[in-house]
Amino acid sequence: STGWVDPFTHFCDPGYEHRETLATGAAAAQAGGFTTVFVVPNTQPVIDNKSQVNYIVQQNHQLPIHVLPIGALSKKIEGKDLAEMIDMHQSGAVASSDGLYPVQSTLLFLKALQYVKTFDGVVIQMPIDKSLGSLGLMNEGITSTQLGLPGIPAIAEELMIARDIELLKYTNSKLHITGVSTAKGIALIEAGKKAGLALTCSVTPYHLYFNETDLNTYDTLLKVYPPLRTKADQAALLAAVENGVVDCISSHHQPQDWDGKTIEFEYAKAGIASIETSYATINQLLPQLNDEKIANLFSNNARQIFNLPSKSIQEGQSVELTFFNRQEVITKSKSYSKSKSANSPFWDKALKGKVIGTFSKGHLHLNTEA
């Protein structure tokens, strides 16, 4: 396949290098088969101006794969004033988003959608209305009641998706919704696409693999945001990947240190370091997808949506390739992880699908161990 692209990862650098650095994140991404990743701006300092974009662009020269910055949509990702989006675009930002902090202000989001049109940019939004279930720890429903945990209702996602689609219609801009977790959310996106909007979406491997009932042991490794939803939601997401409503897989790779996960569920940090097992998870769940569909989900669609070079094999062009085996069953152990953080429920799980290696920036890299 042409080199895989992950459009939503958190490499924690600068500011939180104890959890991940650009170098360790890039190594983990490469092990996972990715030759291009987008990093969210939720760093310290925030990627909200061209000098912060330049930091990532400069660091990228030393890395084995392409690590591209997503420029913040608002200053300091506070959701109040627009950041210098044009400056960041010109300096190399690949998209505009507040990353892990979805934009709550309708006016600001409207302005952002209008603003990116000047440079044919794309806004990425993780859809959660934070005023609903703001203290929630998991999906709101029977399971949350049984476990005695406060919930985040599905409607918090659905309202945000509905709002953002209406704003997209109004502005005729480009929007990518990532981390969709509900059946109704996916249905709204499908309707928006049928209406001809420049609307695309991605889901995470873990929303496809797990559901809320997996939380019955209070496993903090499964504390994620957006939360794991119902079995019916999970089935709807899997169907949407199969039928093409979902454009891409984004790992939402979010490293957390040991202290952030080995505490009570209520206080544990959200997120999974999922980039190394992203492909195997999808291949395990959806073996019926043909090779072309896998290539579209992991590479071609993202390249098209975000105006990246196609990197396919053409005379005189540089190529990016990912080599993968769909039949081999692998069991990744934590000790072989390239990431700085080991917060993943996928370690020691037998998953069908192996990344053999990548060809990126003129170098062939073969994965030597599981």
Where are these regions (language model features)?
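Short, acidic/polar
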Residues: 18-26, 77-87, 163-164
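Gly-rich Lys/Arg/Thr-decorated short loops/hinges at beta-loop-alpha junctions or inter-strand turns
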Residues: 6-9, 34-39, 66-68, 140-149
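His/Asp/Glu-enriched, well-ordered alpha-helical/loop segment
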Residues: 146-172, 242-243, 247-249, 254-324
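A glycine-rich helix N-cap at a beta->alpha junction
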Residues: 58-73
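C-terminal cap of metal-dependent C-N hydrolases
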Residues: 267, 318-370
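Metal-associated gating/positioning segment near the N- to mid-region
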Residues: 1-60
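Histidine/acidic residue-rich metal-binding segments in metalloenzymes
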Residues: 83-249
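Divalent metal-coordination and catalytic microenvironments
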Residues: 8, 29, 33, 67, ...
